[in-house]
Protein backbone atom coordinates (compact mmCIF):
# COMPACT_ATOMS: atom_id res chain seq x y z
CA UNK A 1 0.00 0.00 0.00
CA UNK A 2 2.79 2.39 0.92
CA UNK A 3 4.79 1.49 -2.17
CA UNK A 4 1.83 2.08 -4.48
CA UNK A 5 1.24 5.52 -2.94
CA UNK A 6 4.92 6.36 -3.39
CA UNK A 7 4.84 5.30 -7.05
CA UNK A 8 1.67 7.34 -7.61
CA UNK A 9 3.23 10.38 -5.93
CA UNK A 10 6.44 10.08 -7.97
CA UNK A 11 4.45 9.73 -11.19
CA UNK A 12 2.38 12.78 -10.32
CA UNK A 13 5.52 14.80 -9.51
CA UNK A 14 7.08 13.73 -12.80
CA UNK A 15 4.04 14.85 -14.78
CA UNK A 16 3.79 18.20 -12.99
CA UNK A 17 7.53 18.79 -13.26
CA UNK A 18 7.52 18.07 -16.97
CA UNK A 19 4.72 20.58 -17.51
CA UNK A 20 6.43 23.32 -15.51
CA UNK A 21 9.94 22.95 -16.88
CA UNK A 22 11.36 24.78 -19.87
CA UNK A 23 13.19 21.76 -21.18
CA UNK A 24 12.67 22.24 -24.91
CA UNK A 25 15.90 22.66 -26.82
CA UNK A 26 15.95 24.21 -30.28
CA UNK A 27 18.90 23.46 -32.48
CA UNK A 28 20.56 26.14 -34.55
CA UNK A 29 18.41 27.03 -37.54
CA UNK A 30 15.32 25.24 -36.24
CA UNK A 31 12.18 26.87 -34.93
CA UNK A 32 9.38 25.51 -32.73
CA UNK A 33 7.26 22.89 -34.43
CA UNK A 34 10.16 21.41 -36.41
CA UNK A 35 10.24 24.21 -38.95
CA UNK A 36 13.63 25.06 -40.38
CA UNK A 37 14.97 28.29 -41.77
CA UNK A 38 14.83 27.99 -45.56
CA UNK A 39 17.85 30.21 -46.18
CA UNK A 40 20.17 27.65 -44.61
CA UNK A 41 19.81 25.28 -47.59
CA UNK A 42 22.13 26.00 -50.45
CA UNK A 43 20.24 26.11 -53.73
CA UNK A 44 23.29 24.80 -55.57
CA UNK A 45 23.34 21.67 -53.40
CA UNK A 46 19.70 20.94 -54.07
CA UNK A 47 19.98 21.55 -57.78
CA UNK A 48 23.04 19.27 -58.03
CA UNK A 49 21.14 16.43 -56.34
CA UNK A 50 18.21 16.92 -58.70
CA UNK A 51 20.52 16.87 -61.72
CA UNK A 52 22.09 13.61 -60.54
CA UNK A 53 18.69 12.02 -60.02
CA UNK A 54 17.49 13.08 -63.44
CA UNK A 55 20.57 11.44 -64.96
CA UNK A 56 19.71 8.18 -63.17
CA UNK A 57 22.60 8.28 -60.70
CA UNK A 58 20.61 8.42 -57.46
CA UNK A 59 22.51 6.09 -55.19
CA UNK A 60 20.10 6.64 -52.32
CA UNK A 61 17.13 5.50 -54.43
CA UNK A 62 18.66 2.17 -55.42
CA UNK A 63 18.08 -0.66 -52.97
CA UNK A 64 21.14 -1.41 -50.85
CA UNK A 65 19.69 -4.60 -49.40
CA UNK A 66 22.49 -6.91 -50.57
CA UNK A 67 25.25 -4.93 -48.95
CA UNK A 68 23.25 -4.54 -45.74
CA UNK A 69 22.56 -8.27 -45.54
CA UNK A 70 26.19 -9.03 -46.35
CA UNK A 71 27.38 -6.71 -43.57
CA UNK A 72 24.98 -8.31 -41.08
CA UNK A 73 26.20 -11.78 -41.99
CA UNK A 74 29.85 -10.75 -41.79
CA UNK A 75 29.29 -9.20 -38.36
CA UNK A 76 27.56 -12.34 -37.14
CA UNK A 77 30.40 -14.52 -38.42
CA UNK A 78 32.99 -12.27 -36.80
CA UNK A 79 31.18 -12.54 -33.46
CA UNK A 80 31.05 -16.32 -33.74
CA UNK A 81 34.78 -16.46 -34.46
CA UNK A 82 35.50 -14.22 -31.46
CA UNK A 83 33.41 -16.47 -29.21
CA UNK A 84 35.37 -19.54 -30.33
CA UNK A 85 38.75 -17.93 -29.51
Curated annotation (Swiss-Prot):
Molecular-function GO terms, alphabetical: gonadotropin hormone-releasing hormone activity; gonadotropin-releasing hormone receptor binding
Signal sequence, renumbered to the chain: 1-23
Modification Pyrrolidone carboxylic acid, positions: 24
Chief subcellular location: secreted
Residues bearing PTM Glycine amide: 33
UniProt keyword list: Amidation, Cleavage on pair of basic residues, Hormone, Pyrrolidone carboxylic acid, Secreted, Signal
InterPro entries membership: GnRH, Gonadoliberin
Protein's cellular compartments: Secreted
A GO term from the CC aspect: extracellular space
PANTHER family: GONADOLIBERIN (PTHR10522), PROGONADOLIBERIN (PTHR10522:SF8)
Summary of the function given for this chain in its UniProt record: Stimulates the secretion of gonadotropins.
Family: Belongs to the GnRH family.
Name of the molecule in the record: Progonadoliberin-2
Organism of derivation: Sparus aurata (Gilthead sea bream)
Gene: gnrh2
